[in-house]
């Protein structure tokens, strides 16, 4: 099995990060290979889901999540497009979240499965972490055709333009503002 803790510690030390590593997935992420929670500064790795995978794949998902941690904790290291997108999470099923402070607000995008998957993997911060994870695993374990195949599974078939994301972000923001206007109206009305 891949030595998660060893590479986690090395990455954190090399990037001056103070993070936690957990193998217990948070609620709602039980079927994910990993996630990073920017509120608790915790990298979650689903060892149970990854236990039968090759070591290069286990490493890929650890480095993927560690790169997310660096994006959130050191945004000055990344370009404006990545930084703009960090407040928005678009999942492969069209479920979206906007982070405001330490809270997440939910939104849903409708579309066919292929479009939504492409929308998810085309996000600037996702493309950045997947490219980083691929290069880091090549550096640590060497190149393999299987690793290259894994990486290409996470490359969008057709890249979605950043302007499209900006329009989606505006729609998410608008929906959140409308929701809070209605809540404030309802609370004021019921008093």
Regions found by a protein language model. Name each.
Residues 1-16:
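Zn2+-dependent metallopeptidase catalytic core
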Residues 84-175:
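Metalloprotease/metallohydrolase-associated module, dominated by Zn2+-dependent proteases
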Residues 2, 56-60, 64, 123, ...:
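A structural signal for well-ordered alpha-helical segments within the folded catalytic domains
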Residues 18-44, 53:
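Catalytic zinc-binding patch centered on the HExxH motif and its immediate surroundings
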């Amino acid at each position: 099995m891949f030595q998660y803790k060893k590479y986690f510690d090395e990455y954190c030390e090399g990037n001056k990060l103070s993070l936690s590593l957990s193998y217990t997935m948070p609620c709602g992420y039980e079927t994910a290979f990993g996630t990073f929670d920017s509120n608790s500064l915790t990298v979650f790795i689903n060892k149970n889901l990854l236990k039968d995978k090759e070591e290069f794949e286990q490493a890929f998902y650890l480095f993927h999540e560690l790169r997310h941690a660096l994006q959130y904790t050191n945004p000055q290291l990344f370009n404006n497009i990545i930084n703009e997108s960090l407040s928005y999470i678009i999942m492969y099923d069209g479920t979206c979240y906007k982070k405001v402070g330490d809270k997440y607000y939910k939104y849903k995008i409708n579309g066919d499965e292929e479009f939504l998957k492409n929308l998810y993997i085309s996000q600037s911060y996702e493309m950045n972490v997947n490219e980083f994870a691929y290069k880091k695993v090549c550096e640590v374990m060497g190149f393999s055709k299987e690793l290259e195949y894994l990486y290409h599974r996470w490359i969008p078939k057709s890249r979605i333009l950043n302007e499209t994301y900006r329009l989606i972000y505006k729609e998410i923001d608008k929906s959140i503002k409308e929701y809070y206007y209605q809540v404030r109206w309802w609370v004021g009305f019921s008093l």
